[in-house]
Amino acid sequence: MDAPLYPFKPIYSLKALSLTLGESAELLESLAMRSSNLYRYVPQAKKDGPPRDTYDAYQPLKSIQRKIVDRLLARVRFPAYLHGGIKDPLNRRSIYSNAKVHGNAKFVLLQDIKDFFPSIKVQHVQQIFERLFGFSEEVSKLLALLTTRDGVVPQGASSSGYLANLVFWDVEPMLVTRLEAQGLNYSRFADDITISSMTPLDSATLTKLVSAVTRMLAEKGCYQKRSKLHVRRRGQTLKVKVIDEFVPLTVTGLTIFNQVPGIPKAERKAIRAAVKQLEDQAEHGASWIQLEPLARRVMGRIGRLIACAHPDGERLKQRLHALKARSQVALLGRYAAAQPESAFSVE
């Protein structure tokens, strides 16, 4: 059974935890007792709906959470079905690896966990450290307090993504094993769950699959977001209310009804338009200093094309590089023209 595994010696005392993290036990206990007051609210805008509630820890809690990640959480051997926010040089995890699991699928079942991070309670985190890692109750309770805010896992903290991957550590592997025995593929990227089949599925089977996932979520006090539950056959499109258009079905933003995940046509068109907009702004006199913030964001979007091996990726990348070179040369020319002639004379 493919399941999370912590293959190292358990930590039984606060002294041992102190040595592992390189911080005094007194500091760890002090921060744990007041950790809920050591965050700043950093709302993240979404394409639709209200902003996403995210939090960033203040120092020194932030650096201690980073140590908890690097020295404990990141050392877990994560099962292949988990793809979100995991550092694994031997089996790289990303939106691409997640979508690739379902390439060429005939049927896809998409499910979303409602209010995922706030649903992960401090007791769930303590159970992860106590039962999966094998740590003592004292150590597990302290680590749970250091990685939660107001009794729940705060989205945005460096440790939160790892805890989100591990919260179903004792129930998800059994579900995946049963699905694989039926010839189905399963993956989870944070709160996005995808199940796919290479053969048609009848309505009774689909109902059982939804119920099985619902039961797994309920084990940890989580619920499905009913508005994000979708069942699609190969070739079907999905109507997006925001743009009032039908678009191909995607898994973590990538089309999956081919062997290799791809970027939807509408997104490719938008990326090309963004590059053209930058070129037009440069033609009208915008400097690279003015263009750079937008250019960085556009380059990130181009990176998605390159990662999917789409030919537009390299072409658009070269256009941005050429734009940068032209803009910087033009900036130097304007600077030179603005200087008095004596500034460039040599005696």
Name the predicted role of every residue range.
Residues 110-114, 156, 160, 182-200:
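Catalytic palm active-site di-aspartate
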